[in-house]
């Protein structure tokens, strides 16, 4: 699991606009990332998951999804391997950025259909070539910096 305070994702946790996949690299978001609102479980808090009970509630909110948004706090991303969870965390941020940019354009957005996302996800398991190639690229970039 990766937890982040992704600045482009947080607005989706506090609005009525769901974070939905807008490109194939974020098909795992389909149909949309659920929002965990700690206030509904524990009332007024500091928004931190500080007890086992809150952790269980967050896990239940995640369900079978790869990403859950934490209202006013950030997001949590899961995967079967380190490479997959890092890929998903980065693609979640990128998808949020793209979705926000598209929302500024005129007209309705065309999100990935659940059927399209299912086809992408069927070939995007933890050992997928796309994830492996992207991981190797990121490793090489980090060596150069």
Regions from the language model: what does each represent?
Residues 1-145:
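Glycine-rich flexible loops
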């Amino acid at each position: 699991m990766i937890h982040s305070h992704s600045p482009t994702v947080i607005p989706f946790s506090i609005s009525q606009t769901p974070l939905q996949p807008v490109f194939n690299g974020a098909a795992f978001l389909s149909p949309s990332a659920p929002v965990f609102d700690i206030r509904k479980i524990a009332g007024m808090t500091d928004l931190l998951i500080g007890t086992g009970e809150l952790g269980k509630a967050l896990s239940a909110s995640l369900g079978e999804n790869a990403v859950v948004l934490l209202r006013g706090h950030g997001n949590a991303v899961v995967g079967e391997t380190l490479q997959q969870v890092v890929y998903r965390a980065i693609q979640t941020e990128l998808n949020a950025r793209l979705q926000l940019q598209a929302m500024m354009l005129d007209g309705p957005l065309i999100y990935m259909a659940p059927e399209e996302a299912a086809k992408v996800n069927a070939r995007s398991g933890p050992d997928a070539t796309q994830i492996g190639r992207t991981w190797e690229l990121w490793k090489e970039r980090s060596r150069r910096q």
